[in-house]
């Protein structure tokens, strides 16, 4: 028996073991299948893929974080298997174009990774989102903010056009904002290289922003097409809508072809002229980008002429390539991806030409980019870490060869020998400086005042000194154009010797003031932690005997700011940048002192720079990095707490209402809600309404329009003392739930004007108007009723008499400007002409009798007649004190004579019925 039990238990155990093995194998297989796709998209080189930012036409965009440095990038993932060959060629063209352009307001391309299935583009990460969302959230912008954005857009566009690149798809969706609300032009998928003297043919872009010649399918100039798109964007910034909009695509295209649009009245006149010139149907009459820069609204208050980009044909120095073997294959591959260089053999022939041409210019631009930012393999440990669980890890596109392997000959015929870009107008700033070769590095200074707005303190002093020394002797490190060839060593040594001689002459000139210089240095060290650069300059100028050398101070500050990758434009020369070690190595304390001064200048940019910018005439330029503390408070976690203490709230308005009951306030509110077009309301409480105002199709459509949602509450005044017999005071509270603040304010102002226009206020205005009766002689043609001139005369006299002495008798004609009451008509006047019921369509041409002629003196304080009657309260009718006069809130002297008497007839009819 025991043996039988053992056999049964053994069979049960074996079956349980088999079931466990099957379950464990299934769980293992499910885990492997579920983890495979996650492991594939987990790493891209040293970057860990994180959340999805958005989805575009060609792929997905995710954030990536460097696993060592923590630097964030935006990774655009393109599925090569799902896209056609033509779309992939556009992606390759976008890569080549973005390698040509490096500008502070253009999104940067760092590196490219790929595997068999995907293509990964590592782009600059910006946290501000799209300009489109910013417009939808904020509504139309003020002129100052719109000008700042517009300047940055045309600055980037001018740089692209100088490189013969046309964007062709400019719209707010392709304009991104960084953390400082600066523009970054993105999405060069539609961009094209337009060779000088040629026209573009491809119709592309968005219909709302495309120019008429593109929609008609004609050949067009890409530069003029971009100007049209910029005009539409400027219209959207200032108006909050689009100039051409329609739900039907065919109708929209017809509107764009006609080019007829309406500019609202609130747009300034100078901006209206700019919009008309940019959104011009005829490309020949349309503004060029140079004309846009010269426009008074764009230049602002600065008197200096704007500095445009020079064409690259006048900037890039090209050389003779000895043979086909000397052509860099990587650069040749990138040029092949550009649409205008599809014929490879023709491209090679142009590159081997001894003359300066467009092909050679683009070649040396890309070659210089490769020299400055070589694509090298990633660290082995990082690659192994990312590829440990991935069968096909993304690999970085690297250079197949070094640039030093390919020799170059002499300068090409027609090439600029001394490029003006290096020595010329960009010496004062770093507008087009290189922005860091790796995404792990911070961009070197890139901001530049395109319109000549002056900086303060030592920066402007340094710029002035550089101009005094001569343009050929000093060049800004950041303004040294990175597309030109390296500086000749002999030229560099000559420039260094020139700078050293200038410094020695300056030191010898100031040698007699050594003691005062020491005192000035001590004073500057003490005030460095609490004063700005501008205050230091003013204190130095106020004490003539204490001299501080501005050259050493300003140069040191600039060197330290460029070392720390400051956002300000550095103005130190290339030689000063190379000799900064000698300046810092002469004495140890100088380095710490300079760092202290630098920290005092740059340590708290949010507040002390804001104070410095208050006195400037043009503080809204695209390069001003001033941070508005109000915006920072709104973005912070403690925004609601800080705004309640320091920032004035705009989403709640209270309107006090006096002399009205609760029911009358409700009735007036509901009447006002019903009278406003496109406004709907609902009752959510006994004294509470929910109001929603939706704008219909405007001039630009509803692309950027947003409705308003608000609560309207009627509450008793908390600070009133209720007295018996008096109407309590109420407060109507308007609370914004959603929508633009400016539109909410306008709606509240309209409703408050209706609520506060009480009966007593109207009566007071009528009394004041009655005391200001102007004498006038009414002819028969101007009287549109049965009343005669004598009635008008007596009416004016009796109105004055009533205010001077209420008990005094008046003329027998009438004491009421609107006509006598029925009870008055029964009283005889003693004249030949007795009053009867007036007729609205008959004019009374009866002559004035002798009894009424005594009232012809219109200036007398009172008047009496032989046939007078007692002005008792039982028989008199005073419309200015009666509730029946509520239908007219305007003073009496604002009515025309005919309208006044016709209104009196309506009052007669009501009195007769009573």
Curated annotation (Swiss-Prot):
Subcellular compartments: Synapse
GO process terms (BP): axo-dendritic transport; axon guidance; axonogenesis; establishment of cell polarity; establishment or maintenance of cell polarity; G2/M transition of mitotic cell cycle; presynapse organization; protein localization
Gene: sad-1
Keywords noted in UniProt: ATP-binding, Kinase, Magnesium, Metal-binding, Neurogenesis, Nucleotide-binding, Serine/threonine-protein kinase, Synapse, Transferase
GO cellular component: axon; dendrite; synapse
TM ranges: none
Phenotype of the disrupted gene, per the record: Pre-synaptic vesicle and active zone proteins fail to be restricted to the axons of motor and sensory neurons. Synaptic vesicles fail to form tight clusters implying aberrant synaptic organization in addition to defects in neuronal polarity. Overexpression causes mislocalization of vesicle proteins to dendrites.
Primary location group: other
Domain Protein kinase: 47-298
Quaternary organization: Interacts with strd-1 and nab-1.
Record SMART domains: S_TKc
Coiled-coil stretches noted in the UniProt entry, renumbered to this chain: none
Entry annotated with the keyword Transferase: yes
EC class (word): transferase
The protein's Enzyme Commission number: 2.7.11.1
Enzyme active site: 169
Protein name: Serine/threonine kinase SAD-1
Entry binding sites for ATP: 53-61, 76
Biased composition (Basic and acidic residues): 393-402, 495-526
Protein family according to the UniProt entry: Belongs to the protein kinase superfamily. CAMK Ser/Thr protein kinase family. SNF1 subfamily.
Gene Ontology MF, one: protein serine kinase activity
Function: Regulates both neuronal polarity and synaptic organization when bound to strd-1. Kinase activity is required for the establishment, but not the maintenance, of both processes. Binding to nab-1 is essential for role in restricting axonal fate during neuronal polarization but is not required for regulating synapse morphology.
Residue ranges of the region described as Disordered: 375-551, 563-590, 757-914
Biased composition (Low complexity): 444-462, 527-551, 563-573, 780-796, 850-876
The reaction(s) this protein catalyses: L-seryl-[protein] + ATP = O-phospho-L-seryl-[protein] + ADP + H(+); L-threonyl-[protein] + ATP = O-phospho-L-threonyl-[protein] + ADP + H(+)
Annotated source species: Caenorhabditis elegans
């Amino acid at each position: 028996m025991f043996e039988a039990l053992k056999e049964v238990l053994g069979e049960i155990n074996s079956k349980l073991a088999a079931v466990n093995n099957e379950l464990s194998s299934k769980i293992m297989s499910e885990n492997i299948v579920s983890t495979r796709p996650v492991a594939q998209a987990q790493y891209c080189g040293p970057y860990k893929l994180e959340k999805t930012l958005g989805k575009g036409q060609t792929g997905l965009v995710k954030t990536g974080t460097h696993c060592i440095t923590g630097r964030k990038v935006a990774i655009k993932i393109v599925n090569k298997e799902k896209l056609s060959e033509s779309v992939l060629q556009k992606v390759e063209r976008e890569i080549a174009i973005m390698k040509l352009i490096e500008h502070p307001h253009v999104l940067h391309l760092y590196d490219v990774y790929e595997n068999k299935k995907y293509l990964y583009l590592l782009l600059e990460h910006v946290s501000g989102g799209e300009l489109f969302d910013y417009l939808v959230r904020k509504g139309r912008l003020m002129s100052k903010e719109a000008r700042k954005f517009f300047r940055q857009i045309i600055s980037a566009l001018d740089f692209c056009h100088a490189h013969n690149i046309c964007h062709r798809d400019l719209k707010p969706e392709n304009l991104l904002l960084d953390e400082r609300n600066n523009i970054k032009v993105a999405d060069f998928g539609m961009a094209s290289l337009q060779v000088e003297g040629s026209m573009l043919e491809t119709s592309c872009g968005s219909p709302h922003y495309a120019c008429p010649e593109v929609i008609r399918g004609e050949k067009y100039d890409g530069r003029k097409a971009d100007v049209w798109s910029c005009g539409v964007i400027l219209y959207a910034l200032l108006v909050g809508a689009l100039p051409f909009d329609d739900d039907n695509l065919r109708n929209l295209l017809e509107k764009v072809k006609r080019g007829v649009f309406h500019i609202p009245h609130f747009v300034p006149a100078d901006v209206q002229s700019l919009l008309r010139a940019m959104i011009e149907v005829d490309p020949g009459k349309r503004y060029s980008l140079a004309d846009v820069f010269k426009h008074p609204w764009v230049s602002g208050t600065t008197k200096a002429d704007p500095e445009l980009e020079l064409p690259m044909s006048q900037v890039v120095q090209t050389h003779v390539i000895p043979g086909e073997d000397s052509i860099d294959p990587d650069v040749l591959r990138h040029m092949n991806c550009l649409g205008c260089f599809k014929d490879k053999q023709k491209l090679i022939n142009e590159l081997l030409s001894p003359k300066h041409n467009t092909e050679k210019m683009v070649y040396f631009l890309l070659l210089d980019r490769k020299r400055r930012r070589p694509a090298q393999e990633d660290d082995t440990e990082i690659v192994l870490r990312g590829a440990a669980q991935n069968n096909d890890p993304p690999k970085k596109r690297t250079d197949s060869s070094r640039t030093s392997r390919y020799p170059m000959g002499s300068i090409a015929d027609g090439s600029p020998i001394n490029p003006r870009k290096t020595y010329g107008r960009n010496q004062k700033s770093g507008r087009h400086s290189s922005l860091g070769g790796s995404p792990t590095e911070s961009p070197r200074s890139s901001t530049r005042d395109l319109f000549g707005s002056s900086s303060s303190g030592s920066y402007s002093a340094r710029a002035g000194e550089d101009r005094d020394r001569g343009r050929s002797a000093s060049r800004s490190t950041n303004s040294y154009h990175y597309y030109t060839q390296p500086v000749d060593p002999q030229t560099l040594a000559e420039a260094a010797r020139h700078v050293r001689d200038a410094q020695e002459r300056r030191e010898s000139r100031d040698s007699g003031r050594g003691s005062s210089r020491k005192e000035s240095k001590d004073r500057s060290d003490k005030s460095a932690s609490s004063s700005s650069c501008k205050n230091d300059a003013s204190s130095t100028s106020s004490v003539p005997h204490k001299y501080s050398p501005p050259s050493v101070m300003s140069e040191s500050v600039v060197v330290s700011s460029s070392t720390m990758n400051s956002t300000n434009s550095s103005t130190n020369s290339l030689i000063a940048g190379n000799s900064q070690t000698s300046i810092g190595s002469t004495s140890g304390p100088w380095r710490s002192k300079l760092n202290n001064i630098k920290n005092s200048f740059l340590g708290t940019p949010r507040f002390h720079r804001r104070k410095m910018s208050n006195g400037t005439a043009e503080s809204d330029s695209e390069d001003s990095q001033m941070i508005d503390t109000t915006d920072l408070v709104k973005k912070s976690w403690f925004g609601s707490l800080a705004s309640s203490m320091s920032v004035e709230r705009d989403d709640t308005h209270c309107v006090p209402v006096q002399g009205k009951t609760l029911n009358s306030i409700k009735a007036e509110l509901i009447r006002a809600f019903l009278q406003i077009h496109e406004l709907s309301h609902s009752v959510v409480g006994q004294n509470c309404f929910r109001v929603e105002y939706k704008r219909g199709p405007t001039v630009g459509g509803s692309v950027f329009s947003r409705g308003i949602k608000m609560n309207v509450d009627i509450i008793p005044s908390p600070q009133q003392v209720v007295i018996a017999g008096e109407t309590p005071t109420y407060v109507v509270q308007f609370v914004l739930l959603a929508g633009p603040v400016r539109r909410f304010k306008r709606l509240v102002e309209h409703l408050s004007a209706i609520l506060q226009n009480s009966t007593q206020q109207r009566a007071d205005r009528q009394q004041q108007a009655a005391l200001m009766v102007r004498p006038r002689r009414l002819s028969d043609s101007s009287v549109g009723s049965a009343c005669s001139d004598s009635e008008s005369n007596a009416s004016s006299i009796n109105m004055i008499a009533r205010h001077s002495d209420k008990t005094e008798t008046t003329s027998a004609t009438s004491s009421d400007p609107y006509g006598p009451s029925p009870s008055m008509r029964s009283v005889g006047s003693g004249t030949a002409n007795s009053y009867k019921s007036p007729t609205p369509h008959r004019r009374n041409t009866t002559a004035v009798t002798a009894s009424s002629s005594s009232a012809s003196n219109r200036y007398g304080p009172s008047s009496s007649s032989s046939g007078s009657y007692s002005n008792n309260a039982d028989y008199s009718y005073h419309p200015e004190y009666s509730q029946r006069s509520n239908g007219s809130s305007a003073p009496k002297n604002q009515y025309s004579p005919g309208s006044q008497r016709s209104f009196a007839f309506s009052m007669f009819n009501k009195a007769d019925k009573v």
